[in-house]
Amino acid sequence: MKSLPLLGILAFAANRLSAKHISHHYDVHIMGNYVDSLKKANPPSESNEMISKARYLNKVYFDICEPAYRDAGAIMTQERFKYIALVLNFLYEFCSAREYELAAVTATVLHNTSYLRIFEAPGSDKYKPRGIFQICTKKNYAILESIAFFYHDYVENPERVGTFSIHVLVDITCFWLHMSFAKKRRIDIYDVLSICNPSEYEILRNKSKYSREEVKKAEERFANRDEIYQKMLSIIYINYYRE
């Protein structure tokens, strides 16, 4: 396959960047405070048996992200390449303990960022959506600040969330795990939507309270998310279609 010679480069980039900062022990923090407990509640099962990390990186990057950049006429810089590799590595390692979590989180991240191209929403709002989880509102920036491992000034400096930084990636991974920790067994696309895109989730949950135009827009956006989610389910989980 055309992508196979590059696969080792992608995996190496992610692992090298992680190793560079391993002295900070962020992985111990994430595993000890969140992932170990979730894994204990979710022992290995056929329903959640996943493809290897190398194959996941290969399928998501080469089959989805790279074509999206090409179709948009965007340039895949070395900085972006390394950051995307790091993001996918983090999702696989830290956001996969619960049933279907990796598919739901990957789909939402891809949708939120236009396939890992855009990490900050337009507009002048100080607390506008940023980062792979599109963290928004002062309340959520304050939560991020309170549980972060590295930075504790996100309310004062919210623009930091949209940067290509491993330290920020650690912090926003902690944000996702903190916000979703009560859901011990299974994470689906609605669960991720309720945390990462609460306004859209609220419209879909209470359609009668919103205008027809708002509901239609929310439904269209959700349909796009769900399409990616269904694709991720079929790619990631080995036994997903097994009867």
From Swiss-Prot:
Signal peptide coordinates: 1-19
UniProt entry keywords in alphabetical sequence: Glycoprotein, Signal
Glycan attachment residues as annotated in the record: N112, N206
Name this polypeptide is given: Uncharacterized protein ECU05_1040
The species this protein was found in: Encephalitozoon cuniculi (strain GB-M1) (Microsporidian parasite)
Taxonomic lineage of the native organism: Eukaryota, Fungi, Fungi incertae sedis, Microsporidia, Unikaryonidae
